[in-house]
Amino acid sequence: MELPFLSVAALLLGAGFTLVIWNLACTLWSARPLALPARFVTTGLAAVGVAVTLGMIFALVLEQTATGSAFVRIHSGALPIHIIAGLGGWLTVTTMGVSYRLLAMFMLAPDIDEKRNRVTLWSASAALGIAVAGGFVAVLAQV
């Protein structure tokens, strides 16, 4: 199967996501100290970075631009990590953070910064970190 511009598309898409992440990260950096919803968004941005990086590796290996053994192992076994980072990290955690902000805004109530919400953030971040790191260790340890 010939995919003539897949690696170019992957690199352009990766560059686009990098610019978006950089733009949002600069905005968040200037807004320090971060409110709780912004911390959720920061975790989501880290997760989308992982998902995009894995997607680029998938495309580069599929077109045979990247042929290293580590890249091939990532291509063959890292799809669950890609899904966890994309759906669990980027979409879910970012949506939770935005929901915390929007709920307070539409109810005309003050922002809630309860211990329970911080525990939710730390639990979600820890679960994502363990899943992604453990997944990489498992994939790269394959012989």
Where are these regions (language model features)?
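Hydrophobic alpha-helical transmembrane segments of multi-pass integral membrane proteins
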Residues: 1-143
